[in-house]
Amino acid sequence: MRLILLGAPGAGKGTQAKFIMEAYGVPQISTGDMLRAAVKAGSPLGLKVKDIMTSGGLVSDDIIIDLVKERIAEPDCQKGFLFDGFPRTIPQAEALVAAGVNIDHVLEIFVEDEEIVSRLSGRRVHEASGRVYHVKHNAPKTEGVDDETGEPLVQRDDDKEETVRKRLAVYHEQTEPLVDFYKKLSAESSDSLPVYSRVDGIGSLDDIQARVFEALKK
């Protein structure tokens, strides 16, 4: 199973990715992990990446694609792989096709923006323990304080409504066009691959998981 997982921040991709990895025995691959691993390994490509990152530059799509090809040639990718957060843009998707990297399935977990804003902006965290609450769905016994210590809860900057809306805007601008790209690619390919599926990301974890695995059978 060679899979691309799409979905806005807060749509629940990370949780479903774990289920998919366990069921299919495939690794999750993100560009951030690949870049860090390449730098740590000190490969020629990794040294090039380190120079770019140290100077504050952006790693080019060409280098990212080379890293992808290196990564998916490793033994743990024999059964396939799960791309999370990659490709992000049409040029990256086109480069993936040009490099001959085949994909079986593109799965989008869809949640409306307002639901995501509610999910993320309602989170409150006890920083010392990492305990996470939600003002609506998992409220502390006393508003604003941790159940166990009585210490104050905080809203992380990433979870503030303004930040969430900005991240969603970037997602819609950059990543949504990928859906049309892969639908078109599927329609034009002789084997109808990759299969594109959209799954409703609202409901219990079990319900969403069932929808995901049903979609992946197509």
Swiss-Prot record:
Pfam families: ADK, ADK_lid. Residues 122-159 are annotated as: LID. Its main location: cytoplasm. It catalyses: AMP + ATP = 2 ADP. One of its GO terms (cellular component) is cytoplasm. It is an enzyme of class 2 (transferase). It is found in: Cytoplasm. Residues 30-59 are annotated as: NMP. GO terms for biological process: AMP salvage. Belongs to the adenylate kinase family. This is Adenylate kinase.
